[in-house]
Amino acid sequence: MPPTIRNNFPLFHDFVTASHFITQTILMRLSDAMYLEGSTRFENSHREDKPSTTTLVLLHYPKNFDNAHSGHNKHTDIGSLTLLFTPQWGLQLLSPIQKSKSWLWVQPRPGHAVINVGDSLRFLSGKRLKSCLHRVYPTGEVYQEEDRYSIAYFLRPESAANFEDVDGKVVSAKRWHDEKYVTYTEPHEKQDLSNILTGGMDQILA
């Protein structure tokens, strides 16, 4: 265990516990709002006694990227819900309701978190819910000329949960995670050739 985590373990433990409670509560409320029952309720694919790839990530985007390229290429998140804490500019999203189809800045607000729907929840909902297509992008006008930091809690389904992916294939949550994670590591030019990176949302929002 890294010294920073070991020396601050109670802080990390409390943060993860609170993040998990918040995201699970949102899942339950979504299940209620969509009148889901029994095994179709979202929380029943996120049981705490089952293995999953749920994780906490500390993100750092150095200040000296090439402004001609995104700090993080357009993508949707792998899992169900993302609880994101980001006090600095840099996050953009493509709105499913905006006619211009242009990238919108997400204004950082003190005391607030950003919550994204990811691919797994989209698939578990039968694609009734939409994954958030977003990117991290530097700009000299709004983006602050400093290192950018954010904290993301990625709630993901239990690894054995099954759903239909973007191509209609039945896959496990673990398989979707593994295939998409490989795509994250590829050059942007190769990422753009696959619909895995965006979960097919770029075609829907085109």
Curated annotation (Swiss-Prot):
Family: Belongs to the iron/ascorbate-dependent oxidoreductase family.
InterPro entries according to UniProt: IPNS-like_FE2OG_OXY (IPR044861), IPNS-like_sf (IPR027443), Iron_ascorbate_oxido_reductase (IPR050231), Oxoglu/Fe-dep_dioxygenase_dom (IPR005123)
Known pathway: Secondary metabolite biosynthesis
The keyword Iron is annotated on this UniProt entry: yes
Gene: iboH
Protein name: 2-oxoglutarate-dependent dioxygenase iboH
Function: 2-oxoglutarate-dependent dioxygenase; part of the gene cluster that mediates the biosynthesis of the psychoactive metabolites ibotenic acid and muscimol. The first committed step is glutamate hydroxylation by the 2-oxoglutarate-dependent dioxygenase iboH, and the last step is decarboxylation of ibotenic acid to muscimol by the decarboxylase iboD. The order of the intermediate reactions is somewhat ambiguous. IboA likely activates the carboxylic acid at position 5 to introduce an amide bond, and the flavin monooxygenase iboF generates the N-O bond.
Binding annotation for 2-oxoglutarate: R148
Catalyses which reaction(s): L-glutamate + 2-oxoglutarate + O2 = (3R)-3-hydroxy-L-glutamate + succinate + CO2
Source taxon at top rank: Eukaryota
Entry's cofactor comment: Binds 1 Fe(2+) ion per subunit.
Annotated binding of Fe cation, by residue: H75, D77, H134
One family name in Pfam for this protein: 2OG-FeII_Oxy
First-tier enzyme category under EC: oxidoreductase
Boundaries of every Fe2OG dioxygenase domain copy: 51-157
Species in which this protein is naturally found: Amanita muscaria (strain Koide BX008)
EC number: 1.14.11.76
